[in-house]
């Protein structure tokens, strides 16, 4: 099924082990020159590419939810990603009529850090007792495409929880303390 593909995009849960398994299985099927894109919102590409047999062809391609409404796609270069892989990925993203931006390889990249703060503060305000309508109206009035609570809902709490728990594991593996926010506490209560 994948043999003739020039570029594939893996879009499984934000879980390093699952992504590593999918990478190995997919790379066994695609050509040596095919681009392997990982749709991840938080996991650094250089780390994911360690599971690739050809890290020069490995790149991050982060779509935003809801995909059909969000024009932006983050392209994330890993430490070993080639310029040719970047060029092919830019062409692909433009062909599907999305707007590509190339961002640094760091946990959360650019937009997940910005939107995480935006939605997290919306949820924190909710936890403080501010009425949801006030939070949502303020979000809309700033010119954002979606209000913070609506965006949290559109992204899906279960997905956000998976991202958060993987990020927490990564912090712990690095010997760092994970910052517990009001958003984390509320998600934990709602999802667990």
Which functions belong to the PLM regions below?
Residues 1-192:
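N-terminal glycine-rich phosphate-binding loop for ADP-containing cofactors
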């Amino acid at each position: 099924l994948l043999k003739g593909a020039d570029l594939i995009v893996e879009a499984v849960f934000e879980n390093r082990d699952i992504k590593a398994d999918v990478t190995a299985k997919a790379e066994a099927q695609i050509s040596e020159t095919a681009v392997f894109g990982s749709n991840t919102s938080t996991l650094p590409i250089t780390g994911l590419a360690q599971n690739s047999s050809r890290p020069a062809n490995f790149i991050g391609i982060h779509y935003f939810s809801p995909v059909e409404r969000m024009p932006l796609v983050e392209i994330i270069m890993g430490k070993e990603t080639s310029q040719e892989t970047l060029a092919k990925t830019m062409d692909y993203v433009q062909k599907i009529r999305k707007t590509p931006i190339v961002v640094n390889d760091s946990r959360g990249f650019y937009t997940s850090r910005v939107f995480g703060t935006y939605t997290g503060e919306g949820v924190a305000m909710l936890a403080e007792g501010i009425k949801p309508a006030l939070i949502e109206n303020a979000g809309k009035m700033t010119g954002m495409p979606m209000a913070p609570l609506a965006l949290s809902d559109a992204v899906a709490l279960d997905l956000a929880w998976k991202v958060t728990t993987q990020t927490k594991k990564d912090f712990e593996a690095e010997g760092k303390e994970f910052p517990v926010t009001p958003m984390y506490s509320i998600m934990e209560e709602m999802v667990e």
